[in-house]
Amino acid sequence: MRRLFTSESVTEGHPDKVADQISDAILDAMLEQDPKSRVAVETLVTTGLVIVAGEVTTRAYVEIPDIVRKTILEIGYTRAKYGFDGETCGVLTSIHSQSPDIALGVDKALEVKSGEEVADELEALGAGDQGIMFGYATNETPEYMPLPITLAHRLAMRLAEVRKKGILPFLRPDGKTQVTIEYEDDKPVRVDTVLISTQHDPDISQADLREAIIEHVINPVIPEEYRDDKMKILVNPTGRFVLGGPMADTGLTGRKIIVDTYGGWVPHGGGAFSGKDPTKVDRSAHYMARYVAKNVVAAGLADKFLIQLSYAIGVAKPVSILIDTFGTAKVDEEKLLKVITEIFDFRPGAIIKKLNLLRPIYRKTAAYGHFGRNEEEFTWEKLDMVDELKRAFNM
C-alpha cells in the first residue's frame, strides 16, 4: 500500500523558536550557577518586545534582559528594519518563586514519605507534575527517526547555515520547511513534495530566490535515492515573505511540540520542553522515553518502537508504562516490557542522573528538534544500553 506522510520544521528565527531559545538560554544560565535550580520560564516575543514570565527557585543570579538580547542577536535579528532586533527590543520580566505546594512533592516523593529508602537526595525526587510522555524510534534512518521530520530539520538547518555563512545573504532569519514522503509497505521510497518558506530581502525576485534555494538548500539535503522527476518543489508559494519573525507573528514558548519531537508520526502527550528544568517530567521523561526506544531498535528487538510513560505529581515511579512495536517485534513483547522495566529506572531523579541532565545544555535543543541528533549534549541519543538489552534476550 502506498501512502503519503508529511512533517514540518522551522528555523531558529521562527517566532515560536525564538521564544523557546530564550526560555532555554535562561534555564541554562541558572543551571550553570546552580544545578539544583527549579525553573519554569515562558517567553512571548512580538514586535519590538519580549515578555519573560515564570516560576523560579534558585541561588543563581542572572541578568535576564542581557540573556534575551544576546540570544536574539545570535539568532540573527540584528537590524531594526527587521522589525525586531536584540539591541532595541523592550524586555519585560515577571519572575516569582515556585509554589511551595509543588516543592513538597518534588523534593520528597510519595514513596520516600511512605518509608522507602533511596540512595541520595536526587533519587528522592517526585515527578514535578502529572502527564503522559511518548518516546519513539524507527530503523528507517541512521538517526532512528522518521524520514519526513529528519529531512525537514536538515532543510531548516541548511536555511540558517546559508544565511549565516553569507552564501545566500538575502535571506532573513524566519523560515519553515515541510517534506512529504511517499511510503510503500511502510518503507520510504521517494520524496513527493518539498516546501520551503523563507523570509528574504525585498529586492530579491521570486525566480532568483527559487533558483538559489533549490541549488543551495534543497539539492544538498534531499538524497538522490529519494528523488525523481515527479518530486514537487514549492518555494515561498505566496510569492513574497519580507515581513517575518516576531514583527509578523507573535511567538510563544512551547508551540512547536511536534517539530520538537517526531513530526506527528506518533502521539504527543502535550507537554512542551523549553524553559523547564529536568525535574519536570514533561522534559526529562520524554528524553528517557526516546533513550529507551532508540536502544531497543538499535538492539534489533524491533523495527519500530513506541513507549508511553505516565506520572502523578509528587510520585517518583511511573503510573503506567506501555509499549508498541507495531507488529515489528523480533522478541516476545511481554518479555520486552518486563526487561525494559528491569534495566531502565524511570524515576525522575534516576533519569536525571542517567542522562546527566543538570547541565546547561538546553539552548541547543530548542531549535531543529530534540531527537535524532548526535551532539555530545544529547545524552538520550546514546546507544550504551544496546548490549544489555541483547544479553537479556541471549542475542
UniProtKB/Swiss-Prot annotation:
Binds 2 divalent ions per subunit. Binds 1 potassium ion per subunit. K(+) binds at residue 42. Pfam families: S-AdoMet_synt_C, S-AdoMet_synt_M, S-AdoMet_synt_N. One of its GO terms (molecular function) is ATP binding. It is found in: Cytoplasm. Mg(2+) binds at residue 16. PROSITE patterns: ADOMET_SYNTHASE_1, ADOMET_SYNTHASE_2. It comes from the Bacteria. It is an enzyme of class 2 (transferase). The keyword Oxidoreductase does not apply. Residues 98-108 are annotated as: Flexible loop. Its cofactor is Mg(2+); K(+). NCBIfam families: metK (TIGR01034). Belongs to the AdoMet synthase family. This is S-adenosylmethionine synthase. It comes from Thermotoga neapolitana (strain ATCC 49049 / DSM 4359 / NBRC 107923 / NS-E). The lineage of its organism: Bacteria, Thermotogati, Thermotogota, Thermotogae, Thermotogales. The gene is metK.
